[in-house]
Amino acid sequence: MIIKENFEIKNLTTYKIGGIVKKVFFPETQSEFSELLREQPDAIVLGSCSNILFSSNGFDGEVILTTELKQFEIRGTHVFASAGVKGPLLSQKTAEAGLSGFEFMIGFPGSIGGDVCMNAGAHGQSISDYLTQCCLFDKESKEIVYKKKDELDFSYRHSLLKSGRYILLHAEFDLKKGTPEEIKSLIDRNMEFRKNIQPSLAHPNAGSVFKNPEHDSAGRLLDKAGVKSFDLPRAKVWENHANFIVNKGDATSEDILTLMVMMYNAVKKQYTIELKPEIIFLGDKTEKEEELWNILSH
């Protein structure tokens, strides 16, 4: 296990934002991970840090990073993946094995733990479509438990894991056989779509800022509300897609929250729709940050 103290978390977040964390643990096996969860019940558990905004004020506590939990296995159409396995890697490896289903994950910045927790998806598919069961750590009983797909309360960008009681250790999936040509074609199309619409990680971002409301698109509403012109000194709304915020270089968490509230208010004023954040805000929030986040998450 790797342990780092007084670690600057912005070095790991895709937003390149975040202050000093008191102690960060990098477990390398499932047993190390589950033992840490028993010993550090108040620790924040993170994967690829790709859909989070971490406070520039840091965190006077412990963080567990799953990035070293990279074990995965493919047996026939069955796929086993530890919490830290990256979605694009799994997409590539299953494609090489002639399996179809994970093509939609090719451009995902996240890892399996976070993807299952938020039921990540794209192109009309979600990770829950192929999941069969999860191995979880139950923070209440401090035991390892297994839950089938129908026990995990999956819906749009939601699962039972978002309650915080359960932490994913590994997930199991069942894919379908496909032809290499069809799989590669779909992967290429998905990559091209993401490249044209979404900012690359060369422009630090955390993916979609707001969830889609029922029967509509957050990006469409934000675009119609004129938020693409929103540009602060250190952060701005992405010009090619209104549901993305990029860090222009040295943005703080307060900068991002300020933009989010501006975007939220613009849609609320024009459509009386209150968008819900897709990004998760973590760390020791300042008083101003609490005020801004409360507007977004009330």
Regions found by a protein language model. Name each.
Residues 18, 24-30, 53-71, 117-149, ...:
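Structural signature of FAD isoalloxazine-binding scaffolds in flavoprotein oxidoreductases
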Residues 87, 91, 105, 109, ...:
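Hydrophobic, well-ordered secondary-structure segments
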Residues 4, 11, 17, 52, ...:
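Phosphate/pyrophosphate- and phosphate-bearing ligand-binding catalytic cores of soluble enzymes
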Residues 1-116:
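Anion-binding (especially nucleotide phosphate/pyrophosphate-binding) glycine-rich loop
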Residues 3, 71-74, 131-134, 235-237:
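Generic structural motif
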Residues 52, 94, 103-106, 119-126, ...:
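A generic local secondary-structure boundary/capping motif
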Residues 39, 46-48, 130, 203-204, ...:
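Short, basic and Ser/Thr-rich N-terminal targeting/leader segments
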